[in-house]
A protein has these predicted regions:
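Cytoplasmic helix-loop-helix junction between adjacent transmembrane helices
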Residues: 93-134
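Helix-loop boundary and gating motifs at the non-cytosolic
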Residues: 1-46, 204-241
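C-terminal membrane-cytosol helix-exit motif in multi-pass small-molecule transporters
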Residues: 162-184, 368-376
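Juxtamembrane intracellular "pre-TM" segments in multi-pass secondary transporters
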Residues: 178-210
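Helix-loop junctions at membrane interfaces in 12-TM secondary transporters
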Residues: 80-93, 284-295
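Structural signature of the two symmetry-related core transmembrane helices
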Residues: 65-79, 162, 267-282, 362
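Helix-to-loop junctions at the C-terminal end of transmembrane segments
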Residues: 49-61, 147, 252-264, 349
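Transmembrane alpha-helix termini and helix-breaking/packing motifs in multi-pass membrane transporters
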Residues: 22-27, 138-158, 340-356
């Protein structure tokens, strides 16, 4: 049920996200730099919040209350978007919404690890990603349908997102049960301290660094939506870009998670980076909506390969009692990298056009792939699993 709650929130969030970049640029008059800054700050806020929510969930050994609080904040922001008359309203709503995401993110990921055996974690994270992506497919699909029904009235369509958001909160409150603390791990409680950080292995910090470089190469999906508008896709059909991306993501997330439990994970990460490079190259040269659709599909495939795998690597590299903290630190670094990446993406778009934005993304991905190929684990890295 945790996955279904996440799915309903993704229906709501992705309906909003598939239209929000257009709303900011076309209705509220925001520049590309402004879009990049808002998206970057929003995601960085989520990441910073994840550090503390993860540590708190480790300290109190309670994940569910934080997960419910986070989803609740996400739900109450949804009516603000259609009410917005200035870009500041959107920024404030995104800020609070991402605080909610930050509060729920690390405890939710840690709760998944608490509920499943170690050997099934890759599949479990892949299943959660797949359900997220089903919701992320339905959200933009609803956006397209209601844009057609409501004559491209973006504000009216944004009201639709309110309903699934509150369904998600209700599901989590009623149907999700977490194991008792003693069932997870006995021992002293832990908070976010320097001593805790020292207990995290070099293997874990290498995963954190890898996640940061990955994120530099993968800026906000808002720029995919704006790329579709840039090549001339009709306004009411622009959300179909997110549909294509999320269909591919949903189709491949669970199989990729299962594969991650069975083969060399570094090789799988390199494959994921190669797919991201291909997506960026296609989006760099795109002159038609067909090419943007291909690029969006490749983008979704890259996410399916890498996102659940990175979560598995974090879970496997961290002690059980510090798992929430470990996910929080990982998300902090990734969120900071996303802020930098989105600001750079917006600046390049404004100065040189969309091709520069996606070309830079391909460059960052290539650097990450080369670094991953050159890395050789050492005995003191804590990397004993043959698959890692």
């Amino acid at each position: 049920m945790l996955g279904f709650g996440s799915m309903f929130m993704d229906i709501s969030s992705e309906l909003v996200h598939s239209l929000l970049p257009i709303f900011m640029v076309s209705v509220l008059g925001a520049s590309m730099v402004t879009v990049g800054v808002i998206e970057g700050i929003a995601e960085a806020t989520a990441a910073i919040t994840k550090v503390f929510s993860g540590a708190i969930s480790d300290y109190f050994r309670k994940r569910k209350p934080l997960v419910v609080l986070g989803y609740g904040l996400g739900a109450i922001t949804k009516p603000v978007f259609p009410l917005a008359t200035a870009i500041g309203w959107v920024f404030a709503a995104r800020f609070v919404d991402r605080i909610g995401k930050g509060i729920r993110g690390a405890p939710r990921d840690a709760l998944v690890a608490d509920l499943v055996p170690r050997e099934m974690r890759g599949a479990a994270y892949g299943l959660r990603q797949a359900l997220d992506s089903v919701g992320a497919f339905i959200g933009p699909l609803l956006a397209v349908a209601f844009m057609a029904w409501l004559a491209n009235d973006i504000k009216a369509v944004l009201w639709v997102a309110v309903v699934p958001a509150f369904i998600a909160v209700a599901l989590l409150v009623v149907a999700v049960r977490e194991p008792e603390p003693a069932a997870r791990e006995s021992g002293s409680r832990c908070g976010l301290t320097l001593a805790d950080a020292k207990r995290l292995s070099l293997r874990y910090w290498l995963v954190v660094g890898l996640g940061g470089v990955f994120t530099l190469a993968r800026f906000s999906e808002a720029f995919l939506v704006l790329r579709a508008l840039d090549v001339g896709l009709p306004l009411g059909l622009v959300p179909t870009i997110m549909i294509v991306m999320n269909v591919v993501y949903a189709a491949f997330a669970y199989p990729a998670g299962v594969v991650a439990d069975r083969i060399h994970q570094r090789a799988l990460l390199v494959v994921g980076l190669g797919v991201l490079i291909a997506a960026d190259v296609v989006l760099t040269v795109a002159t038609s909506s067909a090419l943007v659709f291909i690029g969006a599909g490749l983008w979704g495939l890259h996410m399916a390969i890498t996102q659940g795998l990175l979560s598995k690597l974090v879970a496997d590299a961290a002690p059980d009692e510090l798992r929430g903290t470990a996910f929080g630190m990982f998300n902090l670094v990734s969120g900071g990298a996303l802020l930098v990446a989105s600001v750079i993406a917006g600046g390049l778009w404004s100065a040189f056009g969309p091709s520069a934005t996606f070309g830079a993304g391909a460059g960052f991905a290539a650097v990450a792939a080369v670094g991953l190929l050159l890395y050789r684990p050492r005995p003191w890295d804590g990397e004993h699993d043959a698959n890692t």
